[in-house]
Design a protein with these regions (language model features):
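Thiamine diphosphate
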Residues: 1-105
């Protein structure tokens, strides 16, 4: 978030957020799975979105919750003439699928 305080954000700045409402990144990368029960202390269930963040910093904001809306959101994000955020809402289970799709871009 600190980087958004820059008063001269480039118009080609595009941010993609995978929001699974918990911090499930630790289930997608190697290492934390070796911690066993400690993994539950590395997640923080929440109901926050990035929409207010985008409004505060005057960024474009797009959202979606399916692979189809992800593709449409990517098109909007790429075509946007301003610094923008694309927020994809996923479940913990589908988070890995979205992440895999994103890595193929």
């Amino acid at each position: 978030i600190n980087g958004l305080f820059n008063t001269a954000l480039p118009t080609n700045l595009k941010i993609i957020i995978l929001n699974n409402s918990s911090g499930g990144i630790f289930e997608m990368i190697e290492g934390p799975d070796l911690l066993g029960d400690a993994l539950k202390y590395q997640t923080t269930p929440h109901s926050y979105t990035a929409e207010n963040l985008a409004q505060h910093f005057k960024l474009g904001y797009y959202k979606g919750d399916t692979l189809g809306s992800f593709a449409k959101g990517m098109d909007k994000l790429i075509q946007s003439k301003t610094a923008s955020i694309l927020e994809i809402f996923t479940s913990q289970e589908s988070n890995i699928e979205f992440y895999g799709s994103f890595k193929k871009l």
